[in-house]
A protein has these predicted regions:
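Core SAM-dependent methyltransferase catalytic element
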Residues: 219-231
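Conserved beta-strand signature within the Rossmann-like core of class I S-adenosyl-L-methionine
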Residues: 123-130
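SAM-dependent methyltransferase
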Residues: 130-197
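A short glycine-rich, Lys/Arg-flanked "PGG" loop and its adjoining helix->strand segment in the class I
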Residues: 110-122
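Conserved class I S-adenosyl-L-methionine
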Residues: 1-33, 35-42
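Class I SAM-dependent methyltransferase SAM/SAH-binding core
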Residues: 46-85
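A short acidic, Gly/Pro-enriched loop at the edge of an enzyme's catalytic core
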Residues: 85-94
Length: 231
């Protein structure tokens, strides 16, 4: 329920500039490596796939959210409701952008990386970002209320014990001028850099580089971008 509810309210969050810069950064890496035939894991509504296609790069997307994939398919994008473990094709590059890895519990991360390796050709690349501790504690935590037209959205995010728990409340006006209430929670997990390095190496990748991604301040990175290559 949490992710499906999030898909209904995501467009009202002020993430556009950050996502635009993040997508531009990933596109730059893809052009630099001259990569094609890409699987975008956790593709959401398909914005990054659209950027890839607009630049002549073949792309396929998967997501666990039915609502998100409906939007992808409405745009005639090649995307399916699938878990990574269900994918049988091979690709030259995999991307997981805007917190995808942070939605995976620590005990499942290494298997996720192994599943990613399985769907890549030899020497294929895996590009992903993760939130830094600063990104969770100083940027993501907090409360937000959005009151627009026929909707009221309440967000309350608390970061403790390496978990960001975000409670979402949505009130939607019905035809009878009544309000329908929906509630859900999404949980994200902080993964420290040493844990990620170990998990990536165990999954059969080498790490070419780890980049700082600074959006809110130049002093501390909001996210880290990992550039990994299948051995």
């Amino acid at each position: 329920m949490g992710l499906e509810l999030y898909s209904k309210v995501e467009e009202y969050f002020d993430f556009q500039d950050e996502v635009k810069l993040l997508h531009a950064t990933f596109l730059g890496l893809i052009f630099e490596k001259n990569l094609d035939d890409i699987i975008d894991i956790g593709c959401g509504q398909g914005a990054f796939i659209m950027h890839l296609l607009a630049n002549g790069v073949n792309a396929y997307g998967i997501d666990l959210s039915v609502e998100q994939i409906k939007i992808c398919q409405a745009y005639d994008l090649n995307a399916d409701v699938l878990s990574l473990a269900e994918v049988n094709e091979k690709f030259n590059c995999a991307t997981a952008i805007f917190d995808v890895i942070n939605y995976i519990p620590k005990n499942d991360v290494e298997q996720f990386f192994k599943d990613t390796s399985r769907v890549l050709n030899d020497d294929g690349y895996f590009l992903f970002d993760v939130n830094s501790f600063f990104g969770f504690e100083e940027v993501a935590e907090g409360s937000l209320n959005i009151d627009i037209d026929d909707k009221f959205i309440g967000i309350d995010a608390i970061f403790e014990e390496d978990k960001l728990k975000t409670d979402i409340t949505l009130f939607s006006k019905t035809k009878n001028n009544l309000y329908k209430k929906e509630e859900g929670r999404i949980t994200q997990y902080y993964h420290d850099i040493q844990f990620l390095k170990t998990s990536i190496l165990n999954a059969g990748f080498e790490i070419e580089n780890i980049l700082d991604f600074n959006f809110h301040t130049e002093e501390e990175a909001d996210k880290l971008i990992f550039i990994c290559k299948k051995k």
